[in-house]
């Protein structure tokens, strides 16, 4: 019996590759995030920095079953939309297909006749791009995670200061 090591024949890309989609004479650049890549904010951020007009997430959520995993996974796409001010189109083979606008609002969701996301089927959507964000980079897209690091540093300093004050009182 042979075991294939994790990541056996996968080679990471060296640059962001965007797909072009021409609609009505306009060309839209699409940043593709495969499955759980939407969990990693830096991947979406680099696509936006490279000129992506929207993100497309193709995902296999079938292994979650009909639990909350598909909705929790979709929440990451909401974060990516807000962080980068780009719409996100999601296509899941086992739940949660739809689109999220650049403000993080779920604008359309593929549901069956019973109102559930867990079924086989398909649909089409019209995605709106808000002009005020079109081709502009959000603060997060331009500057990244420095605010998170700064907040973590301030929280750590506050904790150490508080512990020091407790030690002085005792």
Give, region by region, the residue ranges found by the protein language model.
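Enzyme catalytic cores with a strong preference for nitrogen-chemistry domains
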Residues: 1-170
């Amino acid at each position: 019996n042979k075991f294939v090591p994790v990541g056996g024949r996968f080679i990471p890309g060296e640059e962001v590759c965007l797909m072009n989609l021409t609609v009505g004479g306009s060309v839209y650049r699409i940043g593709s995030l495969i499955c759980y890549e939407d969990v990693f904010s830096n991947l979406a951020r680099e696509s936006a920095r490279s000129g992506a007009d929207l993100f497309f997430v193709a995902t296999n959520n079938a292994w979650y079953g009909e639990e909350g995993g598909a909705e929790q996974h979709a929440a990451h796409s909401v974060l990516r939309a807000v962080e980068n001010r780009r719409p996100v189109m999601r296509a899941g083979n086992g739940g949660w297909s739809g689109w999220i606008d650049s403000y993080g609002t779920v604008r359309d969701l593929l549901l069956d006749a019973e109102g559930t996301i867990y079924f086989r089927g398909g649909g089409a959507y019209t995605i709106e791009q808000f002009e005020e964000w079109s081709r502009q980079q959000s603060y997060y897209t331009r500057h990244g995670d420095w605010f998170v690091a700064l907040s973590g540093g301030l929280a750590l300093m506050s904790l150490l200061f508080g512990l020091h004050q407790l030690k002085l009182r005792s």
